[in-house]
Amino acid sequence: MLKLRQLQKEKQRQAAQAQAPAQGRSAASPAQLRVEKDLATLELPTTVTLDTKCLGSENKVYLRISPEEGVYRGGHFRFSVVFRDTYPIEPPTVKCLNTIYHPNIDYSGNICLNVLREDWSPVMDLQTVVLGLLFLFLEPNGSDPLNRQAADTMLRDPYRFETNVQATMMGGHLDGQVFDNVRH
């Protein structure tokens, strides 16, 4: 009988040791699982690159958008995309990391894009975000601006707007604001 108890205790100890490493690892959250799914199905156009080096530690990815047409052609614009624990119920937080002259992006990098606000739905994904950002560079929206000055110029004087965009993409100043060189 004593030997039977020793065998039983030994099996329990072995089972506990086998479970210990599994318990030490944290299970992926629903948000992390969804991000992994989004990345697996993501189809990036040639004008967009993705950097996932901070995905595990910060739930963040970086995008680089390089439009080949429109007034922003020739620029390279970096964005951070942060996935909170509430993703996909709530949209990711997206910031432009360059100071640029754009009606829908303010100088702090905040972005006015409906799919990142009131039009977001849990069926949307990272692909939706990428396409929305691309669309902002191809068709800036002057009727729903974060940068009212850029929007007013775009609506009143499209030629001056394009001139301002091209000048600010090379860095420098416009109306007291310093812009990043996004041409390199």
Curated annotation (Swiss-Prot):
CC terms in the record's Gene Ontology section: cytosol; nucleus
Record Gene3D superfamilies: Ubiquitin Conjugating Enzyme
Protein name: NEDD8-conjugating enzyme UBC12
Pfam families: UQ_con
Keyword Lipid metabolism: no
PANTHER family: UBIQUITIN-CONJUGATING ENZYME E2 (PTHR24068)
Active site: C112
Key word Plastid present: no
GO biological process terms held by the UniProt record: protein neddylation
GO molecular function: ATP binding; NEDD8 conjugating enzyme activity; NEDD8 transferase activity
Annotated region described as Disordered, given as residue ranges: 10-29
InterPro entries with a match to the protein in the record: UBQ-conjugat_E2_core, UBQ-conjugating_AS, UBQ-conjugating_enzyme/RWD
Natural source organism: Eremothecium gossypii (strain ATCC 10895 / CBS 109.51 / FGSC 9923 / NRRL Y-1056)
Biased composition (Low complexity): 14-29
